[in-house]
Amino acid sequence: EQQKYLNARKYIELVIVADNVMVKKYTSNSTAIRTRIYSCVNTLNLIYSAFNTHIALTGVEIWSNGDKINVQSNSSVTLDFFGTWRETVLLNRKRHDNAQLLTAIDLDGPTVGLAYVGSMCNPKGSTGLIQDHNKLDVMVAITMAHELGHNLGMNHDGNQCNCGGNPCIMSATLDFEPVYQFSDCSRDQHWRYLIDNRPPCILNIPLRTDIVSPPVCGNYFVEVGEECDCGLPANCQNQCCNAATCKLIPGAQCEDGECCERCQFKGAGTECRAARSECDIAESCTGQSPECPTDDFQRNGQPCLNNQGYCYNGNCPILDHQCHNLFGAGATVAPNACFDFNRKGQGNSYCRKQNGVTIPCARKDIKCGRLFCVQGPIGNTISCQSTSSQDDPDIGMVDLGTKCGDGRVCNSNRECVDVTTPY
């Protein structure tokens, strides 16, 4: 399962914002700004093909009438403002995975870019700041690839890191020559980040109609006007696609996909995604498409694991399993006496937070707040174990949809309600 996730093609739906100083630098020529951005994205795709990741430019915003945040040379402050703007404004206007601010302001000191580390899909953190620091498109694109690398869990390369004797993308200092390779350290950090965090937003395939950059035959992504795209002719390894035209060969129905075999659609009814659990449903090919249908699951609220839980979005969340995940296989759910701490609303024991204030659980809701576990057999003394994280307030809390009583489950407000009501 882990290897399957790592091998799956990833897609980053990217929005690039050009600030008002960019507008002035290019004398209000929005076409020139867009052309530069398109060129940068083409280079990004060349670089990130090493990770089987496609960068889909789904939005370009040019602040022609003035900046929408306070853009200043202090890179940390500007990135903070931009992240907040993305979270509160841009995401409400347009769904996307990552946003980069391209500025013509001279950032502080030698800085030409800044980004949060390991933050892909985070509403504020999936952002970067790029200075338009070089006449060459490719040099700005490499800086963007570097900052995007931070978002994807990569740190700066140390002396022990290498990518074949040349400076690498994640080098701490900018080289004067274009570099296109990630180091062995970057690869390890990126895979570890994906395994540990599984950022959820980078698996869906963007709609062709959402992409704003001109179609490029040879970038491994099927865009408007193309039937297939297997890369440049010298690199194409797909017998179903004409790499020079990005059209299917005569007689071919498809290029690839879970329901495509030898250039033809698999027959209707061919299983393409097995059921992961009793709460999941197996999917089968339609005979009319190369793609496996959208992942579906049993109805929410259906009893599962011998009535220990109720199905929720394809899983069967129960307290014991959540204890195993947090504290290891020997951990089990704690007695009710531990969960009574949630009624106090002190420390990390509560049901929810409102405006930074912890709200204690009502008696009926104690098993929907902080999760408490115990290790090994329970003797005369009970040691209630729990965990929490400042970075992610949901870590250590009981999962949504968990059974909290007969015919009752935890809803999104951390209340224990009738199983027929929260869905």
UniProtKB/Swiss-Prot annotation:
Q: Which residues bind Ca(2+) 2?
A: V216, N219, F221, E223, E226, D229
Tissue-wise expression = Expressed by the venom gland.
Where are the disulfide bridges? C121-C201, C161-C185, C163-C168, C217-C246, C228-C241, C230-C236, C240-C263, C254-C260, C259-C285, C272-C292, C279-C311, C304-C316, C323-C373, C338-C384, C351-C361, C368-C410, C404-C416
- Cited SMART domains: ACR, DISIN
Q: Quick one: which residues bind Zn(2+)?
A: H146, H150, H156
Q: Which residues are glycosylated?
A: N29, N74
List, for all copies, the residue spans of the domain called Disintegrin.
214-300
Enzyme Commission number(s) from the entry: 3.4.24.-
Q: Which GO terms describe its biological process?
A: apoptotic process; proteolysis
Q: Which domain of life is it from?
A: Eukaryota
Cite the binding residues for Ca(2+) 1: E13, D97, C201, N204
> What cofactor is this protein dependent on?
Zn(2+)
> Signal peptide span per the entry?
none
Q: Where would you say this protein principally sits, based on its record?
A: secreted
- Which keywords does UniProt give here? Apoptosis, Calcium, Cell adhesion impairing toxin, Disulfide bond, Fibrinogenolytic toxin, Glycoprotein, Hemorrhagic toxin, Hemostasis impairing toxin, Hydrolase, Metal-binding, Metalloprotease, Protease, Secreted, Toxin, Zinc
Report motif location: D/ECD-tripeptide. 278-280
Family that this chain belongs to: Belongs to the venom metalloproteinase (M12B) family. P-III subfamily. P-IIIa sub-subfamily.
Q: Subunit info? A: Monomer.
Q: What is this protein called?
A: Zinc metalloproteinase-disintegrin-like batroxstatin-1
Give the species this sequence originates from. Bothrops atrox (Barba amarilla)
